[in-house]
Each structure stands twice: as C-alpha cells, then as structure tokens.
A protein has these predicted regions:
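Conserved helix-turn-beta segment of the N-terminal RecA-like "Helicase ATP-binding" lobe
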Residues: 1
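C-terminal regions of RecA-like/P-loop NTPase motor modules
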Residues: 4-14, 28-49, 76-81, 94-185
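Short, conserved active-site loop motifs that form the nucleotide-linked donor/cofactor pocket
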Residues: 16-20
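Flexible beta-alpha connector loops of hexameric P-loop NTPases
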Residues: 22-28, 58-68, 97-101
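Conserved P-loop NTPase "ATPase switch" module shared by AAA+ and STAND
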Residues: 44-60
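Structural recognition of the conserved hydrophobic beta-strand(s) that form the central parallel beta-sheet
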Residues: 50-52, 83-90
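A short alpha/beta connector and helix-capping loop motif
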Residues: 63-77, 84-85
Length: 185
C-alpha cells in the first residue's frame, strides 16, 4: 500500500518521465546504432540520456575499437548539445574485486568516462563502520544493504570512497547512511 501511495503522489511526474523512455528494437543492436540514438536524443534536447545496459549490444569482432568509437562519438554529440550520458553496465564475469576493472565493457569506458559508480548489493545486510562528513558524529556502526563505490570522479571529490545505503525496495525508499571507513582507518 505504501508503494501505491508513493506512486499516486508522484504519478504526474512519472507519466511525464515515461514519455522519455524508449525500448531497443527486438534484436540486439550494434554500438553504432546506440551512438546514433544517443546523438538523436541529445539533438532533440534531452539533458540526461541513459542506456541500460550498454552490455546488451551485439558483440563485435573488435570491441576495443568499437567501444572507443562509440564513446568518442557520443562524447562529441553530448558536448555540442550540453547533454550527459549515463551508461549502465554490469560486473565482469568472475571478478570479485571492487575497482574499474570489475565493470563489464572495454577500457574506453574507464578511460573516457567522467565518473564511474559501482553498486554493490549486500545479501544479507553488511555491518560497516561509517562517518557522516560535515556532521560531528564520529565513527559509528551501521548495517547497510547497498554500497555505492566511487571508482572514478574526474571533476569532483570522493574517488575511492564508498557510501553506504539502506534501500527498502518494497516501499521504494532509500536512506544514505554515510561514508564507509576502510579497514584500518
């Protein structure tokens, strides 16, 4: 019932947002198609463009070249139209480390991105030591079920930090808990 109430409160905004969602064609598409689609949305005036997931694109014979072409082509379209692109990807297979190499896709995404955020789910919830920057609370223990790792922050602070969250998917609610301290801090 709480989720329905939240939907009712935000229905107008959600309906407006829904008109800005496209589905890919039924078949897998090439990165060139996605690049053209991103450019078209940017020229139409969309400020934030999201591709979720970029890893669903048709595999190519030369992914390192095609990834680089895609990123540079998208970057050109976005910069001329003052738009931003969010690419959603997944963890690379058989990788358990939390770093830029743990994301699926080529190095072009790592090298040419402004920011890389990695979402880590904790099932069961994880106990961590945290601080809240700017609030004199000191260290505290907290149980979280999601972590956002800031793997790259080219034009901002926070690279290498991790932020703990409690997300209640049933009620579509979340609460930031603070910055997770690394062991030994």
């Amino acid at each position: 019932q709480e989720a329905q109430d939240a939907y009712d409160r935000h229905q107008r905004d959600l309906d407006r947002f829904n008109r800005s969602i496209w589905e890919r064609p039924g078949e897998q598409v090439a990165l060139e198609w996605v690049s053209e689609w991103v450019g078209n949305r940017a020229r139409e005036g969309y400020r934030v463009i999201v591709v979720d997931p970029i890893t669903v694109c048709r595999p190519s014979a030369q992914p390192w070249i095609d990834d680089h072409k895609f990123v540079t082509s998208a970057e050109h379209a976005l910069s001329t139209c003052n738009a931003s692109l969010l690419l959603v990807t997944h963890s690379a297979k058989n990788r358990h480390e939390i770093d830029m190499d743990s994301i699926a896709g080529g190095h072009a995404y790592q090298k040419l991105s402004q920011s890389i955020l990695l979402l880590e789910r904790h099932k069961p919830p994880k106990e961590v030591t945290m601080v809240k920057p700017g609030i004199d609370m000191g260290r505290f223990q907290c149980e979280i079920n999601e972590t956002i790792h800031i793997c790259k922050a080219r034009k901002g602070k926070g690279q290498g930090m991790s932020i703990g969250f409690i997300i209640d998917w049933k009620n579509l609610d979340f609460a930031e808990q603070g910055v997770i301290l690394k062991k030994g801090q």
